[in-house]
Amino acid sequence: MSKKFFIKTFGCQMNFNDSERIRGLLKTIGYEQTDNWEEADLIILNTCTIREKPDQKVLSHLGEYKKIKEKNPKALIAVAGCLAQRTGWELVKKAPVIDIMFSSFNMHQLPELINQAQAGYKAIAILDELPQDEDKIWEYPVERDNKYCAYVTIIKGCDKNCTYCVVPRTRGKERSRALHSILDEVKRLVDDGVREIHLLGQNVTAWGKDFEKPIPFSELLYQVSKIDGVERIRFTTGHPRDLTDDIIEAMADIPQVCNALHLPFQAGSNRILALMDRGYTKEEYLEKIEKLKEKVKDIAMSTDVIVGFPTETEEDFEHTLDVLKKVRFEQVFSFKFSPRPGTPAAEMEGQIPDDVKTERMRRLLELQKSILSEIAKKYEGTVQEVLVEEEKNGELIGRTTTNKWASFKGDPSLLGKIVKIKVIKSSPFSLEGELLEVIK
């Protein structure tokens, strides 16, 4: 009987893509996935450490999962991802139930680490940078949940060194994946029925800059769009400093590139942006948004915002609210500032009391709620293109080019098709419609 594994993933799309690769790798060595951790022979926590809350969740889950050892003493517990990278042996000392620990840099070593752990050793392998044999990571099959949309990691790491962020420590310096490797994976995915390609990176718009002969990210967009069968292209996450005019032009020029973009601004105050070391001003950010809206028809913007960064005043916070009012984002991921160990911001004077952060967060969410209500109304009566991804409770569900979930009545044979629907009802995060026609 084959062994079973259970995997729980925290954090960003990069982590979810890493988990897809881990799942594919484990299946090549005879493991089967289970949704019940209590029957697993191997439990993997793929972790995030961008804020304190995910750290605490991991420790809580480890406390729960250790019960499996009583039932199955040979069961193994593994911790992967950014928390593993940041803490290493420190976490193992806190939670000795951990048998295996590895980072995103050496996922391909997991079979070897399992063998070490089964022999009774603590299999802890944390690398500070991508190994020379990193291409092995891309060779293993990816086990996806979505048949029609696929993540493709194109760059790892980040060189920006924002003062609040642990990503440069946990994911390393920016290292772009080779163009031929990306295109080969996209071709394989399309051959497998994928219609939407989602390019991923901590700073996806910096792709190609670290090559001996740099290649602009816009060129990658053109190359991917030329692959027969690629119907949609998305990319996440870009950095405002690297969103150049040629990328905006490519977004406008390439039919497959969706009119949706996630572009974190983090704070509206130039003083706070300087303390964060973001490398742009409020005015420069808004200028890029203006160019995007001018060039890319009906573009839907989403963003990240940090509330309560050290020394943030009421005036600073008002600048953040002003950006929300001016841009009118369709989705805002907002977080109270969480000091991360080893970052300059954690040591700054003027830490903001939690009750002040909470109150500012309340006001931000209230403003964004009113903006979303107004945006939702504009969708009613419009015609939207939807890639049908799943059937649920007798309805077909997919996403528009603007990344809105949409549902409508239709035959399951439409799964994987791109259709037009007329929106008859809208809410801030989803649409309901009626089928008009099948496009392709």
From Swiss-Prot:
<dbReference type="InterPro" id="IPR002792">
    <property type="entry name" value="TRAM_dom"/>
</dbReference>
<keyword id="KW-0479">Metal-binding</keyword>
<dbReference type="InterPro" id="IPR023404">
    <property type="entry name" value="rSAM_horseshoe"/>
</dbReference>
<keyword id="KW-0004">4Fe-4S</keyword>
<dbReference type="Pfam" id="PF00919">
    <property type="entry name" value="UPF0004"/>
</dbReference>
<keyword id="KW-0963">Cytoplasm</keyword>
<feature type="domain" description="MTTase N-terminal">
    <location>
        <begin position="3"/>
        <end position="119"/>
    </location>
</feature>
<feature type="binding site">
    <location>
        <position position="162"/>
    </location>
    <ligand>
        <name>[4Fe-4S] cluster 2</name>
    </ligand>
</feature>
<dbReference type="InterPro" id="IPR007197">
    <property type="entry name" value="rSAM"/>
</dbReference>
<feature type="binding site">
    <location>
        <position position="82"/>
    </location>
    <ligand>
        <name>[4Fe-4S] cluster 1</name>
    </ligand>
</feature>
<keyword id="KW-0808">Transferase</keyword>
<dbReference type="GO" id="GO:0046872">
    <property type="term" value="F:metal ion binding"/>
</dbReference>
<dbReference type="Pfam" id="PF04055">
    <property type="entry name" value="Radical_SAM"/>
</dbReference>
<dbReference type="InterPro" id="IPR020612">
    <property type="entry name" value="Methylthiotransferase_CS"/>
</dbReference>
<keyword id="KW-0411">Iron-sulfur</keyword>
<dbReference type="InterPro" id="IPR006638">
    <property type="entry name" value="Elp3/MiaA/NifB-like_rSAM"/>
</dbReference>
<dbReference type="GO" id="GO:0035600">
    <property type="term" value="P:tRNA methylthiolation"/>
</dbReference>
<dbReference type="InterPro" id="IPR005839">
    <property type="entry name" value="Methylthiotransferase"/>
</dbReference>
<dbReference type="InterPro" id="IPR038135">
    <property type="entry name" value="Methylthiotransferase_N_sf"/>
</dbReference>
<comment type="subunit">
    <text>Monomer.</text>
</comment>
<feature type="binding site">
    <location>
        <position position="48"/>
    </location>
    <ligand>
        <name>[4Fe-4S] cluster 1</name>
    </ligand>
</feature>
<dbReference type="GO" id="GO:0035597">
    <property type="term" value="F:N6-isopentenyladenosine methylthiotransferase activity"/>
</dbReference>
<comment type="function">
    <text>Catalyzes the methylthiolation of N6-(dimethylallyl)adenosine (i(6)A), leading to the formation of 2-methylthio-N6-(dimethylallyl)adenosine (ms(2)i(6)A) at position 37 in tRNAs that read codons beginning with uridine.</text>
</comment>
<feature type="domain" description="Radical SAM core">
    <location>
        <begin position="144"/>
        <end position="374"/>
    </location>
</feature>
<keyword id="KW-0819">tRNA processing</keyword>
<dbReference type="GO" id="GO:0005829">
    <property type="term" value="C:cytosol"/>
</dbReference>
<feature type="binding site">
    <location>
        <position position="165"/>
    </location>
    <ligand>
        <name>[4Fe-4S] cluster 2</name>
    </ligand>
</feature>
<dbReference type="GO" id="GO:0051539">
    <property type="term" value="F:4 iron, 4 sulfur cluster binding"/>
</dbReference>
<keyword id="KW-0949">S-adenosyl-L-methionine</keyword>
<protein>
    <recommendedName>
        <fullName>tRNA-2-methylthio-N(6)-dimethylallyladenosine synthase</fullName>
        <ecNumber>2.8.4.3</ecNumber>
    </recommendedName>
</protein>
<dbReference type="InterPro" id="IPR006463">
    <property type="entry name" value="MiaB_methiolase"/>
</dbReference>
<feature type="domain" description="TRAM">
    <location>
        <begin position="377"/>
        <end position="437"/>
    </location>
</feature>
<feature type="binding site">
    <location>
        <position position="12"/>
    </location>
    <ligand>
        <name>[4Fe-4S] cluster 1</name>
    </ligand>
</feature>
<dbReference type="Pfam" id="PF01938">
    <property type="entry name" value="TRAM"/>
</dbReference>
<dbReference type="InterPro" id="IPR013848">
    <property type="entry name" value="Methylthiotransferase_N"/>
</dbReference>
<keyword id="KW-0408">Iron</keyword>
<comment type="similarity">
    <text>Belongs to the methylthiotransferase family. MiaB subfamily.</text>
</comment>
<feature type="binding site">
    <location>
        <position position="158"/>
    </location>
    <ligand>
        <name>[4Fe-4S] cluster 2</name>
    </ligand>
</feature>
